[in-house]
Amino acid sequence: MGVKHEYSGSQGRISIFFGNMSKAPLTNVRAVIDEVDHLRVQKTGTQGLLDDDENGGCTVAVRTQARLLLMVEVAAPFDDAPAMRVCFTTPGGEVHEYPLRLPIVATCFMEPVTLEPEAFMHRWKSLEGQDRECQEVIKTPPDAPPIDEEYMKRIVKIVTEGLKFGRCEGCDTTPWTVSGASTFRTGAKDLKGNNINVGCLVRVEANPTHGAFRVTTRTLHPLCSKAVKNVALVSIKLA
């Protein structure tokens, strides 16, 4: 499988390719995507690929591909990637089924915001409590290098390029903290016809002595707080 995806505001375009590198055709190839309330999804693909019938599907000849295109728009905050099942039959009649997750996470729909230190801290304090905060401590892997300036550069890259947050410098006197701000875009409308968006803040605090990071997120919606924290934790584990 191969995936290409791009996002702008509350919308995304995801292209998925199912290639057959075996020595025989694959039959009854299907991609079944779970319906979710928080995403509006338009699906197109190779004829038969999106069949609901277990006996349907398409045939992928040797060294060819089936293709699936998803056009998505966010309707509400979410904290879990949509599920997809890929099913196919190999020669001899053996049926294979693989549960997967689509690479569609909340941080794909973020728009970076840069705040001055005073503005950041004011918003940070205003988002205390009411299930707006998520926090978790993560240890670096046993084979990870010590947390130093080079390591922190990778953390900055995670926050700015991975999470798509604007870095807010000057919020701390210590070099071991990275703060950022962003806006989660949705296609939903309020009563005045304006798009509903969610302001999001994040702080990643390093503890070089104990080889650990504390990730804290505060947003206007609990699911956004959880989603940003989860993506940050996974990214830091892979840093």
Name these PLM-found stretches.
Residues 1-239:
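A structural signal for beta-rich interaction modules in eukaryotic proteins
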